[in-house]
């Protein structure tokens, strides 16, 4: 399984794209930085996107990805998410006010955009990958994703505070090769992390106590203003196999 980090930050400044992970060149987990990281040619290859939740740092390049490729021959995009997230995109993003409703363009019979509802823990098979949303604990309805192919599995928590079901499923995965989870704020912002459904390094340390598998853990989601403090506090945890995702890097599992 090939994973390219298009963006891995919880905010946007030059050189820091927001959350989006590209699998095997054609499937994305979240869309915070798809059009910001990929050439037009590579954008055309992206056919399926799984959206964890409605927040802009995970959805904001969807409109531009579609707009960039609307006239490309045969282009179509399928977006998968739990019903609450699909409803949010219909009502607040592709609503003919914020952006055109591409689910009916160029016409109702052959739209370039299809919004597909997926129930929590329902598996979807795309491009040789089996992807399963799992509910986590964030400010709005949110899922992480379990991604499996014939050889391995990885788990992506998306944005979350302390959670339980995600770790239960992760611990039972065969051929687990890695976990991607978040740490958004430094410890001195614990109260803010609690009310917004995020993790600090201290809270992350408690969450990793729920992980019973000896696999690499990759961190994302840091707010650009606080990255230095977050990295220092994560290093102080002295946990082996705990590193930060690197934007632009390709990982192979």
Question: Which positions does each model-derived feature cover?
Answer:
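Active-site metal-binding motif and surrounding structural segment of the metallo-beta-lactamase
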Residues: 35-81, 176-177
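Cap/insert and terminal regions of metallo-dependent hydrolase folds
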Residues: 163-252
């Amino acid at each position: 399984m090939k994973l390219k980090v298009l963006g891995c930050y919880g905010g946007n400044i030059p050189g820091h794209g927001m959350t989006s992970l590209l699998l095997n060149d054609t499937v994305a987990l979240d869309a915070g930085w798809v059009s910001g990281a990929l050439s037009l040619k590579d954008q055309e290859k992206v056919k399926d996107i799984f959206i964890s939740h409605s927040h802009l740092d995970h959805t904001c390049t969807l409109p531009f990805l579609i707009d960039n490729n609307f006239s490309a021959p045969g282009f179509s995009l399928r977006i998968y998410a739990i019903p609450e997230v699909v409803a949010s995109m219909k009502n607040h993003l592709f609503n003919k006010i914020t952006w055109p409703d591409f689910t009916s363009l160029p016409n109702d019979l052959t739209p370039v955009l299809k919004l597909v509802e997926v129930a929590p823990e329902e598996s979807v098979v795309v491009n040789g990958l089996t992807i399963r949303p799992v509910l986590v604990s964030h400010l709005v309805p949110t899922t992480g994703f379990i991604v499996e192919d014939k050889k391995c599995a990885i788990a992506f928590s998306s944005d979350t505070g302390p959670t339980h079901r995600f770790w239960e499923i992760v611990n039972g995965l065969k051929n687990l090769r890695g976990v991607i989870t978040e740490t958004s704020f430094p410890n001195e912002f614990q109260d803010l992390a609690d009310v917004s459904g995020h993790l600090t390094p201290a809270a992350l340390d408690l969450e990793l106590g729920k992980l019973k598998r000896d696999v690499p853990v990759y961190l994302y989601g840091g707010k650009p203003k606080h990255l230095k403090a977050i990295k220092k506090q994560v290093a102080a945890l002295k946990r082996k196999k705990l590193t930060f995702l690197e934007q632009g890097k390709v990982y192979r599992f």
